[in-house]
Amino acid sequence: MSHPNLLVELFVEELPPKALKKLGESFAGTLAASLKAGGLAGADAVVTPFASPRRLAVHVTGVAAKAADKSVLHKLMPVAVALDAAGNATPALLKKLAALGADASVVPSLKRQPDGKAEALFLDSQVAGATLAEGLQKALDDALAKLPIPKVMGYQLADGWTSVNFVRPAHGLVALHGDDVVPVATLGLVAGRSTHGHRFEAAVPTVELRHADSYAEQLETEGAVIAGFEARRAEIVRQLDAAAAAQGLKPIDDDALLDEVTALVERPNVLVCQFEPEFLAVPQECLILTMKANQKYFPLLDAAGKLTHKFLIVSNIRPDDASAVIGGNERVVRPRLADAKFFFDQDRKKTLESRVPGLARVVYHGKLGTQGERAERVRAIGHAIVNQLRMATIPYTVDAQDEFAVLDSKVQQAALLAKTDLLTDMVGEFPELQGIMGGYYARHEGLRDGVAIAIEDHYKPRFAGDALPRNHTGTVLALADKLETLVGLFGIGQLPTGDRDPFALRRHALGVIRILVEKNLPLDLPALLNGAVPAFGELIEDPRLALFDFMRDRLAVNLRDQGYSAQEVDAVLALEPARLGDVPKRLAAVRAFAALPEAAALAAANKRIGNILKKAEGTVEARIDAALLAEPAEQQLAAALAQVQPGADALFAQGEYAASLQALAALKAPVDAFFDDVMVNAEDPALRANRLGLLATLHGAMNRVAELARLAA
């Protein structure tokens, strides 16, 4: 039998826009989950959340008027306590039964069964299912209690005496089961079928809902409200795209801004506005941030991604003549843009170098000193990185004009100036622009080629998917800056814990990993840490072991997120490769090897060899004495290994990891024969030691790219 659908709406004053989406999802999800748990809604019930600035609502399909009765087995007490020697009920049992609404007449029907400790008595009773009014009241109370509200407000109800606490004052409650009102109450409100539409543009003062299923349609036609968050968001996107296309432009793509604007309007209406073109002399990042952060506007870009003097607003009203709305928004944004222009002009009156002494007055961390001291540490770490690139066994090619001495000089200059924009008016107003403004001011001063870009890029990557630094100077500076942060904070014990990572150390670690891997730099992570620690002198404890493990864990998570299996990642990282730029090639090689028909047997054999070597007494040397190869199978394995290993090693040295691993496939047959025909732990100590040496040599040859035993099932 099908059941009617349910609609519940709480009508409130304007909700916090940044929290609205989560509030709507939480309200709908918790209420529906409670109904399902109470047997009033099926597991397959469709739950539709609604959330607008002035309402939280949910529509649930197939809700029963009453939950089914159910049988409940109540454990009473051990038989020895419940019955006396004659088998009669004890006072303790009668008291327990009375508490459950039963009497002595049910004693003969009580069930006996063990409870894990002793035999006990159980009462099998029928519990009536909750009515919808009962179940919905509980669900509504749960949903409101579990809303993710950071701060509540207290307000008085209409009686003038009662006070309640909620995120915003509530003024209406709707609960419809089909076309019937469900008698529930909350926050001093009793459920009905009346709600309100748009504050200014509703066709009727109150919307009388006919049915649970007519909620969205009636609110839109009678109340001028698009109640669904996603439906309203989609309508805003449609209007933004259409308005931008009509201008031959495109709106900026910003999901967070779109969500916030969706939470601010109930009837979106997109309008085109503009500002004076002379403001475009200010860096577009400043203007865009001003319009987005302060005014919630959508700047318009041309086909090349350059900011234009036009922007879009999302109004909550649709007047016949929108000129007043457009003019008002253009008038409001003008002082904001003028402020940005003033900051930009004032900042350029001082050079970045003249601001360097001011860094000594900006505290970075109580235990790590000032930004001035930090800049000197970044310079020292940058110098160490350049030296490591110079000495790398794999040549690192810099630009023709960037000999290593020149590169080091640029890194030193960029590191000294990188944080000076923290002292500018623009960054003081918009901290999000740090680095970006430093780059603009450096270009304005005509600093050396590449230094301005390095200053601008040294925070990159700022987030997942962000671009990496664009030049060599920026790459070294970004590494040095992130390593300074990681080493310093780990060195004073400020490690991330659980969900808490106030210094974004996970992001910094991932930034180092991405730069090393994606730019395939010939740098070893342990060497980088070794080069960074001395910059701190006596300020910190040695963090290298903990930090290396931390970065290894972040690398493993990142690789799994890219689609590599846990086995593949474990196999490569088990060798703790120092050069992270090698890791993608090693993973590709492992994946190719695993697809070979010989892979499973070789991985299993590798695991077996590892276990044998672990159990061997003393140190096993990877050495083979041909004169002690007594059995044909061990002779054949030694010969096959002698033939395969040089080629595999040469391929490994050339970075041809896939080919190196694939060369090992030829060892499957002799390895299988060895384990079938040869007793490793021979009684003769010399034979035993030689066979262990053969296995150690084989183990070393097989595990240069990855620890193949990790691939064994």
Curated annotation (Swiss-Prot):
Enzyme class: ligase
Disulfide bonds: none
Matches recorded under InterPro entries: DALR_anticod-bd (IPR008909), Gly-tRNA-synth_bsu (IPR015944), Gly-tRNA-synth_heterodimer (IPR006194)
Keyword Ligase carried by entry: yes
Location of the protein in the cell: Cytoplasm
Listed EC numbers: 6.1.1.14
GO biological-process terms attached to the record: arginyl-tRNA aminoacylation; glycyl-tRNA aminoacylation
MF terms in GO: arginine-tRNA ligase activity; ATP binding; glycine-tRNA ligase activity
Reaction it catalyzes: tRNA(Gly) + glycine + ATP = glycyl-tRNA(Gly) + AMP + diphosphate
Gene3D superfamilies recorded: Isoleucyl-tRNA Synthetase, Domain 1
Any Pfam family hit: DALR_1
Superkingdom in the source lineage: Bacteria
GO CC field: cytosol
Alphabetical UniProt keywords: Aminoacyl-tRNA synthetase, ATP-binding, Cytoplasm, Ligase, Nucleotide-binding, Protein biosynthesis
Keyword Nucleotide-binding listed: yes
Family to which this protein belongs: Belongs to the class-II aminoacyl-tRNA synthetase family.
Quaternary structure, from the entry: Tetramer of two alpha and two beta subunits.
Protein name: Glycine--tRNA ligase beta subunit
Source organism per UniProt: Leptothrix cholodnii (strain ATCC 51168 / LMG 8142 / SP-6)
UniProt lineage: Bacteria, Pseudomonadati, Pseudomonadota, Betaproteobacteria, Burkholderiales
